[in-house]
Amino acid sequence: SLSGLAGAVAAKGGIGIISTAQIGFREPDYHQNPHDANLRAVKKEIRRAKELAHGGIVGVNIMVATRHYEEYVRAAIETGADVIISGAGLPVTLPEIAAGVPVPGNGRPVKLVPIVSSLKSANVIFRYWMKKYKYLPDMVVIEGPLAGGHLGFTEEQLRDIPGMHFEEEADRKEIPVVMAGGVYTGEEAGKWISRGLSGVQMATRFVTTEECDAHPAYKQAYIDAKEEDIVLVKSPVGMPGRAIRNTFLQKAGKGAIPHGKCHGCIKTCNPADTPYCITEALIRAVEGDVENGLLFCGSNACRSERMETVGTILDEVADALK
């Protein structure tokens, strides 16, 4: 998700989220200097999304596992991001980083939102942030096993979710809890909210929108996908993920795929023994080479039947919640 989709969602009353993962791939110097290209693009995409949002809420998703994590957080806050969502690891230092960055102009203080996959990981974050920073999350995203991309869940699955209501008595701060993963329709969103959650995060449904920044061929791959085409894969970064079966995955299953210069994306990736470069694979996919790229998706990608608009989807969700 880049500024086009994030801005459109925010303009319609949702929280539009930009992914910072190798966000600078469209910059002319990306392959020569990915670090600077990514930081530049973070700022460009946030500014553009906020212009499109017309006062709506725009946030960024920054993986803890990303190299230069702190720099991306700082750049996002300096540019006026309203929300920082952070997972793929425990964002234990996020409040400290944010505290050191002045909010631009008369902007709103940035909201800090960890992604958790279990009650245990949520409690770790709560206790650590409170003890070290006297700060509690402004919201929590629970990422379930039906989500797209890298998955944080293991055996605990969704067992604890219905009882996850967080409140810190000392501060009387009630913390909204948002469900992510496997939510595709307004009716499904309503079911989670009726169970006491504050909201839902939807991603897969928005890939096949006119406003999504991905290549049309990427969107068509979702529309063409059948349930049996969606498989679990092991990412080079050491986490499981879900993707659409294609030529690339068949080749990856038979052995390492040669790659070029390291783009320095993930802390845990060792270029010397990685089976393939996840950055190169994801960029090929988002640029339209859907047979030779990695098509990350959620479990509901096979439910995509046609192109839609952001407004149509959010109207459906709003109607279901009435």
Task: Give the residues covered by each predicted segment.
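Short His-Asn-centered micro-motif
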Residues: 87, 180-181
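Active-site entrance/lid segments in N-terminal catalytic domains of soluble metabolic enzymes
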Residues: 1-168
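Conserved active-site-proximal phosphate/metal-binding subdomains
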Residues: 147-178, 184-322
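Short linear motifs at secondary-structure transitions and domain/linker junctions
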Residues: 34-39, 59-61, 82, 115-117, ...
